[in-house]
Amino acid sequence: MKGLRKLLLVLGVMLLATGVALAAGGEAASGEHHYDWTNLGFRLANFAIFIAIIYYAAGKKLIAFFGGRRKGIEQELNDLETRKTDAKKQLGDVEKRIADLENERKAIIAEYQAQGEALKAAIISKAETSARQIVEQAKKSAENEVKYAKDAMREELADMIVDATEKLLKERLDGKEQEKLIDKYLTKVVLN
């Protein structure tokens, strides 16, 4: 009902404005055509009826559509404002990270240098340990080789001494002296 009042008010204002505009044109000169007010009245009435039918048939839907559209636009504006605020915050974070990037780079370099030094020290320590083990193993191998060589030389020398002694004894001792020596040693063994 309130909408119908507005519609009638608008139509009345349009009718008056049209009448005033036509009246301002002045008196019609002789032979000139006079304006047909009846035609204008029918046209305005036709227009008013058309608007009334549209309002009656789809008024609530149009109001709901434009009201819903208004709410949708308000919601979209609020969402855009929220996104704008979030974007400003993210931009601030990115700018802060960019500002801290040099410090972060220095920290990363320092960390990797420390890791590199630790790795270098570990490698050097392992290499020194391996070198000591190799030297000790070489010393043991050399000592074993020397011991083996000494034992081989002693064995060979003992064999040579035994051979030389046998030869010397065979040359100096004859059968009688051999029997005397055997008897002498057997007597010592039996007495002891």
Swiss-Prot record:
Q: Name one Pfam family in it.
A: ATP-synt_B
**This protein's GO CC annotations:** plasma membrane; proton-transporting ATP synthase complex
Q: Membrane-crossing residues? A: 7-27
Instruction: Explain the purpose of this protein.
Output: F(1)F(0) ATP synthase produces ATP from ADP in the presence of a proton or sodium gradient. F-type ATPases consist of two structural domains, F(1) containing the extramembraneous catalytic core and F(0) containing the membrane proton channel, linked together by a central stalk and a peripheral stalk. During catalysis, ATP synthesis in the catalytic domain of F(1) is coupled via a rotary mechanism of the central stalk subunits to proton translocation.
Recorded family membership:
Belongs to the ATPase B chain family.
Quaternary context: F-type ATPases have 2 components, F(1) - the catalytic core - and F(0) - the membrane proton channel. F(1) has five subunits: alpha(3), beta(3), gamma(1), delta(1), epsilon(1). F(0) has three main subunits: a(1), b(2) and c(10-14). The alpha and beta chains form an alternating ring which encloses part of the gamma chain. F(1) is attached to F(0) by a central stalk formed by the gamma and epsilon chains, while a peripheral stalk is formed by the delta and b chains.
What NCBIfam families would the database entry show? ATP_synt_b
This chain belongs to which protein, by name? ATP synthase subunit b
Gene name tied to this protein: atpF
